[in-house]
């Protein structure tokens, strides 16, 4: 599994509605194409600054997404119209874990 971490700050004069429309369009592209091995996305922040965590099955899938023509055009538009600045990083997940209280039969299982 591979996670891309993207932190952005939008320009003060940014058309936030247009930015969100473009984000939705890119989400539709990445989710409809199995070649990108997209797992999911979490977004945190407000209208002008945020962090996006994108999860892919593999680094290779994330690289294919970074080369997607629609995504490349969106990145170019983002630099021209929306972003004041951004930074990204990625990491391969070496382990993961989960907890789901609903799957327990009783609280006694915690002890």
Regions found by a protein language model. Name each.
Residues 1-50, 59-67, 83-111:
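Short S/T/G/P-rich N-terminal loop/turn motif that feeds into the first structured element of a domain
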Residues 75:
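Metal-dependent phosphoesterases centered on the DNase I-like endonuclease/exonuclease/phosphatase
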């Amino acid at each position: 599994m591979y996670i891309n971490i993207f932190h952005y700050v939008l320009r003060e004069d940014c058309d936030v509605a247009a930015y969100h429309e473009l984000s939705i369009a890119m989400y539709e592209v990445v989710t409809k194409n199995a070649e990108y091995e997209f797992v999911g996305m979490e977004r945190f922040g407000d209208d002008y600054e945020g962090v996006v965590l994108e999860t892919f099955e593999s680094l290779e899938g994330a690289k294919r997404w970074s080369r997607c023509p629609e995504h490349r055009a969106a990145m170019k538009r983002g630099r021209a119209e929306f972003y004041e600045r951004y930074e990204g990083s990625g990491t391969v997940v070496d382990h993961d874990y989960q907890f789901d209280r609903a799957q327990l039969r009783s609280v006694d299982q915690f002890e």
